[in-house]
């Protein structure tokens, strides 16, 4: 059974992330969205809320599970029995970092392969950082995130 682990901070999860998860759910038996605590990134949303938002966005996909984690990714992958890391590549600029990460992960978890997917063209420009910036300035983010995520961002910046 192929179990793919899609790690990220997902602060917040975007339609680009959702697109990759939907496509992965057709390719793999089981997809785990691994939401990283990422305290050094100082996330806008706490881990628990990011996990809940990802669950809401993917609830229509029966073979997708969302789990928060704060350990080393290689250890988490082993705990979950994952045999593939899934990563998205939006542009050539993503490749260099992802290539380094894949090689490091190969050293730490040699039994887990790294697989890269490119997003659908309509989502290739979306990033969580840009979505947060637009939301913070009161812009319309409905094209970039699920309605539940848009509501959470609106509420967060209302404070």
Swiss-Prot record:
SUPFAM superfamilies: Nucleotidylyl transferase. Pfam families: CTP_transf_like. Its cofactor is Mg(2+). Keywords: ATP-binding, Coenzyme A biosynthesis, Cytoplasm, Magnesium, Nucleotide-binding, Nucleotidyltransferase, Transferase. One of its GO terms (biological process) is coenzyme A biosynthetic process. The record marks 17 as: Transition state stabilizer. Substrate binds at residues 9, 41, 73, 87. It catalyses: (R)-4'-phosphopantetheine + ATP + H(+) = 3'-dephospho-CoA + diphosphate. The keyword ATP-binding applies. It is found in: Cytoplasm. Pathway: Cofactor biosynthesis; coenzyme A biosynthesis; CoA from (R)-pantothenate: step 4/5. Homohexamer. PANTHER family: PHOSPHOPANTETHEINE ADENYLYLTRANSFERASE (PTHR21342:SF1). Reversibly transfers an adenylyl group from ATP to 4'-phosphopantetheine, yielding dephospho-CoA (dPCoA) and pyrophosphate. This is Phosphopantetheine adenylyltransferase. The lineage of its organism: Bacteria, Pseudomonadati, Pseudomonadota, Gammaproteobacteria, Pseudomonadales.
């Amino acid at each position: 059974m192929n179990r793919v682990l899609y790690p990220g901070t997902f602060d917040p999860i975007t339609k680009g992330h959702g697109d990759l998860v939907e496509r992965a759910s057709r390719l793999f038996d089981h997809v785990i969205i691994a939401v990283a605590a990422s305290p050094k990134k100082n996330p806008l949303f706490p881990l628990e809320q990011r996990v809940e938002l990802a669950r809401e966005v993917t609830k229509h996909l029966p073979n997708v599970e969302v789990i928060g984690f704060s350990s080393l990714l290689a250890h988490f992958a082993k705990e979950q029995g994952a045999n593939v890391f899934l990563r998205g590549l939006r542009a050539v600029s993503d490749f260099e970092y992802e290539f380094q990460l894949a090689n490091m992960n190969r050293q730490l978890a040699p039994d887990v392969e790294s697989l890269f997917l490119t997003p659908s063209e309509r989502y290739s420009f979306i990033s969580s950082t840009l979505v947060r910036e637009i939301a913070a300035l009161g812009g319309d983010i409905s094209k970039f995130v699920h309605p539940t995520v848009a509501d959470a961002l609106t509420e967060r910046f209302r404070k």
